[in-house]
């Protein structure tokens, strides 16, 4: 029996839609769409054209359905740490890019509230100046966070736009620097120490969860209907999941960010 899946992999410099055809114990892949990606400068900050990215997501799905009328499911992964704030279901723009230097001024202040050594003990996440924890703290200082009633990492936002269902995927959430390595949920002690509103950080969902179907409007636009699945939405996590390796084996990760 043949099964067909659509993987949408979006990096900091390009995105691609790859159809996987599983048949007779083998997997064949077919890249059906590719688009350039990159940061833009707006009002002195580096941002993502998140609406433009979403339009490319839909264009690629349409290209996939044109070639493969039946697709069993699709999912999206992207780079980590960046996110979209929402109000009443709509994005509060801009969507800042991790390369923007807005976090530099708040890093020391974050560590005054919770020293990095303690953060590392609780989360296991190495220090990077672009980690979401510093971005969110800066958004709190400027008042943007208080305007929001929801918070989604970039791939979960794109999936939400496709199917209308919000989810907070575990592997990508760990890149925020806010997830407890012990409980595998957002750490309330860190949130309280930084005065980040806990209402924005509900329970996490594990990869492999079926979110639903494409919304009727999206299905009409792309020319087909399929299940929308929550993959390991951090692109590195999805890449590692595909490596045929033993437990506790080392791997090397390098991308545009490095």
List where the protein language model places each region.
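Short alpha-helix plus adjacent loop in nuclease-associated cores
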Residues: 96, 100-114
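Residue-level signal for inorganic ion chemistry
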Residues: 49, 74, 100, 139, ...
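A charged helix-plus-loop insertion that forms the helical arch/lid used to bind
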Residues: 90-102, 174-178
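Gly/Ser/Thr-rich active-site cleft segment
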Residues: 10-12, 120-236
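Short beta-strand segments
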Residues: 9, 75-78, 152-155, 231-233, ...
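N-terminal glycine/serine-rich phosphate-binding loop of ATP-dependent small-molecule kinases
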Residues: 1-94, 105, 121, 147, ...
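Glycine-rich phosphate/pyrophosphate-binding beta-alpha loops
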Residues: 12-15, 78-82, 104, 175, ...
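Catalytic phosphate/nucleotide-handling subdomain of diverse soluble enzymes
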Residues: 220, 227, 234-258
């Amino acid at each position: 029996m043949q099964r067909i899946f659509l993987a949408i992999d979006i990096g900091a410099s390009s995105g691609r839609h790859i159809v996987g055809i599983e048949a007779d114990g083998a997997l064949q892949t077919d890249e059906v769409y590719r688009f350039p990606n990159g940061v833009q400068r707006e009002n002195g900050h580096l941002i993502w054209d998140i609406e433009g990215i979403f339009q490319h997501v839909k264009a690629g799905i349409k290209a996939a359905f044109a070639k493969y009328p039946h697709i069993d499911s699709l999912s999206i992964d992207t780079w980590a740490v960046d996110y979209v704030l929402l109000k009443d279901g709509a994005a509060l723009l801009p969507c800042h890019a991790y390369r923007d230097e807005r976090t530099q001024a708040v890093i020391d202040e974050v560590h005054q509230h919770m020293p990095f050594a303690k953060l590392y003990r609780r989360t296991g996440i190495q220090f990077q100046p672009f980690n979401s924890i510093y971005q969110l703290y800066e958004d709190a200082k400027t008042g943007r966070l208080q305007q929001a009633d929801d918070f989604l990492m970039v791939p979960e936002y794109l999936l939400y736009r496709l199917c209308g269902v919000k989810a907070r995927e575990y592997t990508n959430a760990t890149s925020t620097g806010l997830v407890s390595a012990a409980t595998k949920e957002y750490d309330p002690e860190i949130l309280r120490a930084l005065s980040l509103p806990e209402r924005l950080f509900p329970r996490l969902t594990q990869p492999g969860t079926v979110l639903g179907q494409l919304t009727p409007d999206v299905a009409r636009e792309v020319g087909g209907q399929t299940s929308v699945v929550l993959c390991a939405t951090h692109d590195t996590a999805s890449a590692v999941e595909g490596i045929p390796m033993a437990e506790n084996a080392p791997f090397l990760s390098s991308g545009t960010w490095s």
